[in-house]
């Protein structure tokens, strides 16, 4: 019996033994080592050691591995209606033989999980666009963040795009409406961001360049270009300088007005990269709620 899994961006750079425990169950290290050595567990059809790190787009094959089916299926599968499929297909910016690019809506996850049901992977898995294949998630975009998002159509494209993101050859531009004013209109943030993995504290370097596009005494419109790709990087960095993003319910001050807007005012505005000497540039139009808050706060976006 063979069972295959596609590694999504959530587990990028995670050791294979930890991936197994996270996705298949809390197996003893000895059993995992034995299964890897015997070839019952392979990555991209190759035997690997337990220290091998998986990458987004990798295919993990289990051959007669005694996994617990109930644990494997802990992620809730979302079955979209035809209306939901059509709504998301209408958000597509580009559709070619290797990948699609869409303007993701706020409030929808990239992939399913124990906390998320409605997600893009399950939606497009049932779209005619992926009739002869399946969607591959190649990078992260928070559930509440809108904007440019890419999904590969086949394994080779997934591996290529993932490597471009990992090698920082994809140039991303984000827009955010944040509270208050920054000290400098142009600059770079270099921070040590802390996250926790199974109660273990992990500190990671985070770099972002930024430019203030417009501001007043109450709020600012910021353009940000992350150099590193840490979880919640932009949200954490703006919070750290005292200017949390409007609508951020996690990184905020206690006196933040919840009634101002329920949407996170963070938008993946543009992505640029090169494939075989061809330049790809994709821009996602601002959501209506973002433009509405700009108008309410009397902020001007140069391209709007």
What are these regions (language model features)?
Residues 116-124, 155, 218-273:
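Pseudouridine synthase
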Residues 47, 231, 279-281:
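Short, solvent-exposed loop/turn motifs
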């Amino acid at each position: 019996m063979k069972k295959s899994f596609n590694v999504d961006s959530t587990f990028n750079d995670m050791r294979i033994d930890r991936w197994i425990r996270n996705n298949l169950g809390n197996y003893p290290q000895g059993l995992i080592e034995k299964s890897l050595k015997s070839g019952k567990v392979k990555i991209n059809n190759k035997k690997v050691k337990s220290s091998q790190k998986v990458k987004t787009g990798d295919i993990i094959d289990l051959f007669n591995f005694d996994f617990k089916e109930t644990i494997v299926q802990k992620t809730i599968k979302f079955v979209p209606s035809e209306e939901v499929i059509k709504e998301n297909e209408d958000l597509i910016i580009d559709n070619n033989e290797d990948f699609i690019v869409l303007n993701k809506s706020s409030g929808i996850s990239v992939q399913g999980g124990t906390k998320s049901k409605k997600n893009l992977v399950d939606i497009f898995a049932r779209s005619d666009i992926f009739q002869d294949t399946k969607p591959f998630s190649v990078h992260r975009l928070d559930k509440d963040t809108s904007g440019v998002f890419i999904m590969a159509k086949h394994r080779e494209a997934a591996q290529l795009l993932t490597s471009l993101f990992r090698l920082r050859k994809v140039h991303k531009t984000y827009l955010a409406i944040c509270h208050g004013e920054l000290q400098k209109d142009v600059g770079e943030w270099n921070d040590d961001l802390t996250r926790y993995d199974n109660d273990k504290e992990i500190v990671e370097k985070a770099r972002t360049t930024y430019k203030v596009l417009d501001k007043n005494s109450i709020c600012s419109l910021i353009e940000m270009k992350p150099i590193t790709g840490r979880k919640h990087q932009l949200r954490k960095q703006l919070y750290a300088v005292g200017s949390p993003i409007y609508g951020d319910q996690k990184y905020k001050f206690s006196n933040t007005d919840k009634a101002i807007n329920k949407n996170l005012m963070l938008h993946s505005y543009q992505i640029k990269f090169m494939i075989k000497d061809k330049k790809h540039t994709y821009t996602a139009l601002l959501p209506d709620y973002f433009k509405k808050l700009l108008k309410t706060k009397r902020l001007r976006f140069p391209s709007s």
